[in-house]
Amino acid sequence: MTLKTLAGAALAAGSGAVLYLKLLRQPILTWGATVEEAEARLPGDELLEDADGVATRAITIDAPAAAVWPWVAQMGPYPRGGAYTYDWIENLLGLNMHSADIVLPEYQQPQVGEGFGYGANKMSFKIVEPKHVLATQSANGNWVWSFILDEQDGTTRLISRNRFRLPRLRDRIGMIPMEPGSLLMERKMLYGIKQRAGKLASQRETARA
């Protein structure tokens, strides 16, 4: 490969990075969220004040929070309920995810301090407010993942916020190409919760009829 070719490749890569950072990154990190949601201080933010990266994604679910919460509460690797996304991708990464289509009664009462493995990370519940907030944090403190359920008129706004501390420059650079992949997985997860919550709400309505 000639010096000219290398220079051209470097220029193309640099131009692509600039394009991504200026035009694509923010929509990827805030998919589904309103400007207000993306900029708001949310429960769980206080667990990691000096985050180097934040992703806020959201979806509206046509079901009350009581039908959404069970799916959030039981999330996690087997024997918990999985993450409702592409299990085969997560399992290639060694996460042992098996997305449940039923409510698992034994995982409906997460407790503050309770932990579970998540690949190389050990996560623990830091904030548990049933039908409203569930926040977890990694053992090293560098990752906080919070779910906020905001019910209005029988529908629920489900907000997922990830906050990261990336101590090393290589970590910060390495995170950039991972961001589109995280959107792919999280979008599937949010739709997975929406589908399950809607079905559960319908089942409960039928049972009451």
What kind of feature is each model-predicted range?
Residues 7, 11-14, 19-112, 203-209:
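Hydrophobic ligand-binding cavity/cleft-lining segments
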Residues 31, 37-38, 137-195:
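Beta-strand/loop substructures that line and gate deep hydrophobic ligand-binding cavities in soluble
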Residues 100, 117-119:
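Flexible, solvent-exposed loop/hinge segments and secondary-structure transition points
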Residues 2, 13, 168-171:
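Amphipathic, low-complexity, repeat-rich surface-exposed segments
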Residues 54-56, 120-121, 142-146:
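Short, surface-exposed coil-to-beta transition loops
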